[in-house]
Amino acid sequence: MSKRDYYEVLGLSKGASKDEIKKAYRRLAKKYHPDVSKEENAIEKFKEVQEAYEVLSDDQKRAQYDQFGHAGANQGFGGFGGGGDFGGGFGFEDIFSSFFGGGGGRRRDPNAPRQGADLQYQVTLEFEEAIFGKELNVEIPVEDPCDTCKGSGAKPGTSKETCKHCSGSGQVSVEQNTPFGRIVNRQACSHCSGTGQMIKEKCTTCHGSGKVRKRKKINVKIPAGIDNGQQIRVSGKGEAGVNGGPXGDLYVVVHVRSHEFFEREGDHIICEMPLTFAQMALGAEVEVPTVHGKVKLKIPAGTQTGTEFRLKGKGAPNVRGYGQGDQYVVVRVVVPTKLTSHQKDLLREFAGQEEQDDSLFGKLKRAFKGE
């Protein structure tokens, strides 16, 4: 299933301002948050809104998304948050605090489903591998539900008990003296961490956490035409969710090794081709390396050093599937450092014959200097 456009997710046009993006996110996050929404697919919608906001609220990520779409949306994405929240730097409490002045809004249900943490994996590709794409089997460390206790954290054959300190509510009342008098606040129970349940006998495998550290093998398809610094999102391959929530995502960040002959500029490939003075002066047909194999290139007589030739369709494929780049060949004259006596005599004879024509002689000197 293809991903929806991020602007469409937030109900915005492509030219939306940062303030409009933030307002749209706050409205939709409040609407779809699992603690509030009764819609069946609220978790997925909240996750979709969160993902769109994370990209469009960041100038660099937004520019990458506008240029490359979902394939390049997260270029340069930094570290990822922990698995105990829906990630993203603008939480549900922020939404309510903006309406109620902070602290007085509804608290998150600790037993509500929560998305698992996102993971990041760095991979280095050869120049040609990035051009043509490849499949990789990567091994990443993840926290998965404990097989022994099925993720409950309790010893098999036992179950969690209702917390006696909060009577299973997950919250306790705390009185505070303020300049306005004594007030009573509700806060998370410290004994059960707000869950309302206690583990009397912990699982000996996971020690009550309900999770164990494992190494998981994941197949990752690198699309043809991916460039250095771009990343691939593998949905649902991050950390396991909490309380039945969806798993996080895996982000594979691509690094491409430099090539000794080719350079890349977007979908185009650039190279320099050394030629002799005779080839450029008299014309020649030469073989030029490309990532697709060698091709023949005709050099017209009188070609000047620095001249650029275009090999159509010999560049990198567009990572979004929009055609193929070209290869540009820049020719450079190579001045010989060692000459035989015969070669020197021929050059002196040539120089003597053409010395009367200052313009031609000047061109010759500039050609040998590589200007």
Swiss-Prot record:
The residue ranges of the J domain are: 5-69
**Segments traversing the membrane:** none
Please provide the record's keywords in A-Z order. Chaperone, Cytoplasm, DNA replication, Metal-binding, Repeat, Stress response, Zinc, Zinc-finger
Localization per record: Cytoplasm
- What GO MF terms are annotated? ATP binding; heat shock protein binding; unfolded protein binding; zinc ion binding
Q: Where does Zn(2+) 2 bind?
A: C163, C166, C189, C192
Cellular compartments per GO CC: cytoplasm
Coiled-coil segments:
none
Tell me the cofactors it needs: Zn(2+)
DNA damage among keywords: no
Q: Where are the CXXCXGXG motif repeats?
A: 146-153, 163-170, 189-196, 203-210
Extract the Gene3D superfamilies matched here.
Answer: 6.20.20.10, DnaJ domain (1.10.287.110), Urease metallochaperone UreE, N-terminal domain (2.60.260.20)
Indicate which residues the UniProt annotation says bind Zn(2+) 1.
C146, C149, C203, C206
* Cofactor-binding details, from the entry: Binds 2 Zn(2+) ions per monomer.
For this protein, the record's NCBIfam families field holds:
DnaJ_bact (TIGR02349), PRK10767.1 (NF008035), PRK14280.1 (NF010873)
Q: How does it assemble?
A: Homodimer.
UniProt name for this protein: Chaperone protein DnaJ
Q: Please name the source species.
A: Bacillus cereus (strain AH820)
